[in-house]
C-alpha cells in the first residue's frame, strides 16, 4: 500500500520552521479552449527532519503523501534529488 501514495517534485522555498519546510510544486496544464501551456504552482508544508538530511532552501525534493502530522502537514520529504548550489 505504501507505493499507492501520491508523490510530487518541488523546490524548497522556506525552512525557517522547526521540522517543517515549505515546498513549491509547479504543474503544467494545457488550457482547454486556447491550448496554451499554463504553469500553476502550489505550496505545501512538508515534514523536514533536522540534522544532516534536512532539506535547505533551493533544494529540489521529492515529497510523499502521509498521514496528518499537524493541522497543515500531510506530506513528508521522501528524497532530496538535488542540493542547492
UniProtKB/Swiss-Prot annotation:
Name of this protein: Small ribosomal subunit protein uS17
Organism: Mycoplasmoides gallisepticum (strain R(low / passage 15 / clone 2))
SUPFAM superfamilies: Nucleic acid-binding proteins
Subunit structure, as described in the record: Part of the 30S ribosomal subunit.
Gene3D superfamilies reported for this sequence: Nucleic acid-binding proteins
Record GO terms (molecular function): rRNA binding; structural constituent of ribosome
GO biological process, one term: translation
Alphabetized HAMAP family for the sequence: Ribosomal_uS17_B (MF_01345_B)
Pfam families noted in UniProt: Ribosomal_S17
GO CC annotations on file: cytosolic small ribosomal subunit
Amino acid at each position: 500500500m505504501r507505493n499507492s501514495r501520491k508523490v510530487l517534485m518541488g523546490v524548497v522555498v522556506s525552512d525557517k520552521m522547526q521540522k517543517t519546510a515549505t515546498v513549491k510544486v509547479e504543474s503544467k496544464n494545457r488550457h482547454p479552449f486556447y491550448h496554451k501551456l499554463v504553469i500553476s504552482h502550489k505550496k505545501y508544508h512538508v515534514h523536514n527532519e533536522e540534522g544532516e538530511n534536512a532539506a535547505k532552501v533551493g533544494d529540489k525534493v521529492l515529497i510523499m503523501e502521509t498521514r496528518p502530522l499537524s493541522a497543515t502537514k500531510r506530506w513528508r520529504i521522501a528524497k532530496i534529488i538535488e542540493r542547492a548550489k
